[in-house]
Amino acid sequence: MQQLFLKIVLIYKKQEGNLNAYSFWEKAYFDVYSTLLKNAHPITGLVYAWTNFEGKDPQNCYYEVTGSGTYNSYQYDACRTPWRITMDYVWFGNEQARDYLQRISRFVQAPIYAQYDSKGTIWYGGGGIQNIVDSYWTNGLRRINPDYADWGHRHAIAFVGSFALASMATNQSNVDICMNELSTLQALRYYESSLGLLYSLLASGNFWNPL
């Protein structure tokens, strides 16, 4: 939620006429997007769960991934990213947010098989919102853990819902497909239940801009 908090602080500081504070928080707000875009895969838009300021592997800092996979994969920490960026887009109309959401929505809609960009770099599509699973490497390849049946297999609301919200930056037809899929899912755990509620509030227009 960092970018939303920073945006709200920005608006309040501007209204107060505190230009020094406004400049400080404005830089912080855009730095969040800078880090996000440095780390995001150039085609899929998928991001690490944890990264450093330059969008690279984290060093000399603490990160906890034992409950959901590796720091450099799109797992249960990272899956919240499209939801957060969607909130910035629908509340404030941020163009960087829109562009990012459109990129990650293209990943969701792309065929699931291996594909290559103009430089010969391999990547994989999500296969449509109905085929989204609960763990990926950032190039779109499913991250399947053979010792734990959940990862890379479950059609989990934590992932599906966040991607569904990202569709709000695309077109109505895609939104309808994604939201219909979201409406069919039930959460199995506390974490997913919490995210499912938050996703549904935003999808239904009940997660209001506080300003």
Task: Locate predicted features.
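Extended ligand-binding clefts on enzyme/binding-domain cores
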Residues: 1-161, 165-170
